[in-house]
Amino acid sequence: MDNSSVCPPNATVCEGDSCVVPESNFNAILNTVMSTVLTILLAMVMFSMGCNVEVHKFLGHIKRPWGIFVGFLCQFGIMPLTGFILSVASGILPVQAVVVLIMGCCPGGTGSNILAYWIDGDMDLSVSMTTCSTLLALGMMPLCLFVYTKMWVDSGTIVIPYDSIGISLVALVIPVSFGMFVNHKWPQKAKIILKIGSITGVILIVLIAVIGGILYQSAWIIEPKLWIIGTIFPIAGYSLGFFLARLAGQPWYRCRTVALETGMQNTQLCSTIVQLSFSPEDLNLVFTFPLIYTVFQLVFAAVILGIYVTYRKCYGKNDAEFLEKTDNEMDSRPSFDETNKGFQPDEK
């Protein structure tokens, strides 16, 4: 009998009508390629973020760390706790809760630095908070995950991939450190790298969505609970960050800065950690959450920007600045012409 007429060309064992066809490894290859590309692009984004850090100003905030300390409490206190409360209250699956917590433990994103400039925030504080949260995430993310996932780990329903998370965070810190060095030695080149990195960050999000849509097609059947968490989480971060900063006696412009740094997470990092840490079966359940958070953190950031612009127009620029001077800290507020120039237009 001619087996070639009934067996596929790639069959390995044929006997009559019975054939053994090897499983397609296309998804496995694509998954490996995606993980590698995401890691490289994320390293480029974080390298560019480091190029936005001026070492002497960063050290200045370290010497007067009250603003950074408030930001630290927001970043690694409020956000993980909020993620835990939302996860327990909504009753989502343990693996989904872990991803929500990873998002809550992620450091601030570079987008907050741009928005801080647009809302007349403290640019030096914004960049310093982003840098500090990125460096501290190396220890704080595993610690927060250990504390908040204990109820699921002890019950045996989930295993936290600390090794993958640790490798991702180490790979994150090294490019930031190199970027800081480049900005210290070659500030003009660092400014160009920063702009390239901003574009790379957008490409990274699009790439995650497109390739992820191919690999994890069932992930796009999104539970309403994840939509609800993805909506509430960023607005809770913005609001709680603002009120905690105000409660700590920070001036209005720093309150706006802390609010943005708290609510705007590094979603590219979260997506990369999730991609590297979970099995394809788990990714089908959780892959879309970082994208949901990305959408709503940008939506609410745009709302905040719109409210602030309206406020400035209603009060007038001079009146608005006068109101902020009542904080008695305007004399110490850095001038935008003298602060971080990464987001300034090139001089002609």
Swiss-Prot record:
Expressed in ileum. Monomer and homodimer. It comes from Mus musculus. It catalyses: taurocholate(out) + 2 Na(+)(out) = taurocholate(in) + 2 Na(+)(in); cholate(out) + 2 Na(+)(out) = cholate(in) + 2 Na(+)(in); taurochenodeoxycholate(out) + 2 Na(+)(out) = taurochenodeoxycholate(in) + 2 Na(+)(in); tauroursodeoxycholate(out) + 2 Na(+)(out) = tauroursodeoxycholate(in) + 2 Na(+)(in). GO terms for biological process: response to bacterium. One of its GO terms (cellular component) is apical plasma membrane. It is a multi-pass membrane protein. GO terms for molecular function: bile acid:sodium symporter activity. Residues 1-28, 109-126, 179-195, 246-284 are extracellular. It comes from the Eukaryota. Plays a critical role in the sodium-dependent reabsorption of bile acids from the lumen of the small intestine. Transports various bile acids, unconjugated or conjugated, such as cholate and taurocholate. Also responsible for bile acid transport in the renal proximal tubules, a salvage mechanism that helps conserve bile acids. Works collaboratively with the Na(+)-taurocholate cotransporting polypeptide (NTCP), the organic solute transporter (OST), and the bile salt export pump (BSEP), to ensure efficacious biological recycling of bile acids during enterohepatic circulation. Its main location: membrane. This is Ileal sodium/bile acid cotransporter. Belongs to the bile acid:sodium symporter (BASS) (TC 2.A.28) family. NCBIfam families: bass. Glycans are attached at residues 3, 10. The gene is Slc10a2. Keywords: Glycoprotein, Ion transport, Lipid transport, Membrane, Phosphoprotein, Sodium, Sodium transport, Symport, Transmembrane, Transmembrane helix, Transport. Residues 328-348 are annotated as: Disordered. InterPro entries: BilAc:Na_symport/Acr3 (IPR002657), Bilac:Na_transpt (IPR004710), Na+/solute_symporter_sf (IPR038770). It is found in: Membrane. The modification Phosphoserine is found at residue 335. Residues 50-87, 148-157, 217-224, 306-348 are cytoplasmic. The chain crosses the membrane at residues 29-49, 88-108, 127-147, 158-178, 196-216, 225-245, 285-305.
